[in-house]
Amino acid sequence: MVRVCRFVDYCSFSLQGEKMKKIAISFSGGRSSAVMTLLVLQKYPDADIQITFANTGFEHEDTLRFVDACDRNLFGGRVVWIEAVINQEPGIGVGFKVVNYETAARDGEPYIAGVRKYGLWNKTNSSCTARLKVEPMQKYLKTKGFVRGKHLNHWTAIGIRADEIDRLSVNRLRDKVVYPLVEAGVNKREVLRQCAKWDFDLRIDEHYGNCVGCFKKSTRKLATIARDTPEYFEKWRMIEEELKDFKKQNNYDPATNFRRIYRKYMTVDDLVQIGSESGFRGFSSAEKDSQGYMFDDFDFETGCGESCEIY
């Protein structure tokens, strides 16, 4: 197990005498999140722990397989799969429904429903995480007695690693957010070493994580996906074409009179073009970790996999 002793020392702490009796875990479907979840479950077998996974319909199929495999092999079937329910009527908030590995959306249904109500999501209209993950999971947790706001009664465990401390929330004490991997000193290499022991480990590189075509990913990652597996962008192209008129004030391209999903008003076809150029150097996590190339504008990213959002 990854540095269990340091983790145990950390998880024995209390804040102003308050023990961690209720813990919410948002399982992202990634390796770091899996290791963190396992550690928390092992340390707190008697705590009221709720594990949720929010599916947007645009996750890679292997992410869904990994979530299911972790649940069956490590977490004792405790993961609750949540999907947003978007009511198109004005003034009605986001709901949720509980699904499972077999019934989970795989054609972008929750995401597309959200775009039809809230407009094309992009860098200036980036509420997709809130609408498709945060709100549905919080509403589910409320049905289990996990309350937020001024009556906050639980901790939230986040799978950020020790090599990602710049992502920690500045409001972590106020919001009762804990980072077990950070406090345990667990970095990416240690997470990979742990997951390599599992015969159900993820089989995709990191740029396929979260929503495959997410606008928050770097241009290099997106162009690499467009080059290697262009079929993943067919739905994104449909969204771009059919819903480009929604809320023009957000990421509005004055040259075309339409909104765009990607940075610098790029379209799906622009990403395909970049990936097809002879001099394009595709993304590789191994090369990135070894600093095999210098980072430039192609490598700038923010978002679900890079931000410090609670869920």
Residue locations for each model-derived region?
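Nucleotide-activated chemistry modules centered on ATP-dependent adenylation/adenylyltransferase
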Residues: 3-311
